[in-house]
Amino acid sequence: MPAHGRLSIPVPCQREKGTYPFFEEKQSSVVRKHNNKWRVVDIVVAAIIAVASGVIFWGWDIVCTAPLALFGAVTPGFEGLLNAFWLFAGPLAAIIVRKPGAALFAETLAAALELTMGNQWGVGGSLIVGIMQGFGAEIGFAVFAYRKWDLLSTTIAGALAGIGCGLYYWITNPAWSTVRASIYLGTSIISGAVLAGMVMYFLQQAIAKTGVLDRFESGRAQVLV
C-alpha cells in the first residue's frame, strides 16, 4: 500500500539513444530506399563501360564474318547465337550503376562509337539495332521497378536485348523465311540471356569483390533494392 493512500504510477523506462543498437540498425534499414537519381559518377562509369563495350563491338565486327558464316551454315538462323557480343553493354552498365536508363544509355553510346569507328553494318545495323537492344535490356529492369538487380532480372534483360536484335534483323530481312527468322530470334534470345545476362551478372559480382565498386550499391556488401 503506497504511503498516504496515494497510488504511484510507474514511469516507463526511458531508453537512451544507442541502448539497443541492433534494433536501431534494423529500423534504419527499413526506411532506406533505393536512390534512382543519377550522380556524376554514375554517368562517368556508365560512359566508360559504353566506350569499352563499343571498342569490343568494333573488334568483333572485324572478326565475326567467318564465325557467323560457319554457324549459319549449320542451320540458317543459328548465327544469332553469336549476337551477345553486341548485347552486353546495357545489362552490364545497368547492374553496376543501378539507375533507370543506364542500359539504354550504355548500349546506345556503345553502338554509336562502334559506328563512328567504322564497320560493315552502317547506321541501321549499328545504331538503330543498338537502340532496340538497349530498350530491350532496359525493359528487363523496368518490369521490376528498378528495384531488382539479381541474376533473374539481368538474365531477362539480356534475353530482351536479344529480342531487340532479332526483331531488327527479322524486319530488315523480309526475304527470310519464317522458320529462319524464328530460329534467328530464338538463338538471339538464348545468346543474350546467357552471355549478356548471366555472364555479365557474374562479371559484376567478381568486379565488386575487388572493391572498385564501393561507391555504388552494387559494390556494397548489404544493399537494399
Language-model segments: what does each one mean?
Residues 41-50, 128-170:
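Short helix-perturbing small/polar motifs within transmembrane alpha-helices
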Residues 110-137:
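Interfacial aromatic-anchored transmembrane helix boundaries in multi-pass membrane proteins
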Residues 49-57, 90, 114, 133, ...:
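Alpha-helical transmembrane segments of multipass membrane proteins
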Residues 69-71, 147-225:
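Membrane-embedded alpha-helical hairpins and interfacial helices in multi-pass inner-membrane proteins
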Residues 8-37:
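Short, Lys/Arg-rich, polar N-terminal cytosolic tail immediately upstream
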Residues 43-47, 84, 88, 100-108, ...:
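Hydrophobic alpha-helical transmembrane segments
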